Amino acid sequence: MPQIHLHAEPGDYAPVVLLPGDPNRATRIAARFDGGLDASRLVSQHRGLLGYTGTVDGVPVSVQTTMMGAPTTSIVMEELLNLGVTTFIRVGTTGGYGGLGIGDAIVALSAVGSAGMASVLGGGEPTAPTADFDVVEALVAASRANGLVTHVGPVVTSDV
């Protein structure tokens, strides 16, 4: 069944999806897939929610913009779950933490929801969902292999 916001069908997305907020960033990421943007398949553009599927080193991968904030991100992720996506990797910018430099990589072990949508989804109780350790290890290894200063640990998410 097509999803109401993404207008996508099962099979449109790879099991692994990169999630930038900015639609322009989604297009820039898809342009780095094997064969560039021309080889990527545009799978969603409804409501400005740009999504592409392609490959990276022969491995299927998708990128899907979430726009800004936890409410829209939760809608996009729920629809992607309905379409069979199993791994979500948030990429892009973030609010500031002391001691971090511009261009540093942050690999989140868990995300504590402090207010707003995270509180609603957690039933008003504090939650700290944790990331899959194999994914964390792969992200840390790739980040360091690319020479990035890499920070690993819990993060806080808030949309208020």
Place the predicted regions along the sequence by residue:
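Active-site rim beta-loop-alpha module in soluble metabolic enzymes
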Residues: 129-160
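Metabolite-binding pocket within alpha/beta catalytic cores that recognizes anionic/polar moieties
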Residues: 1-138
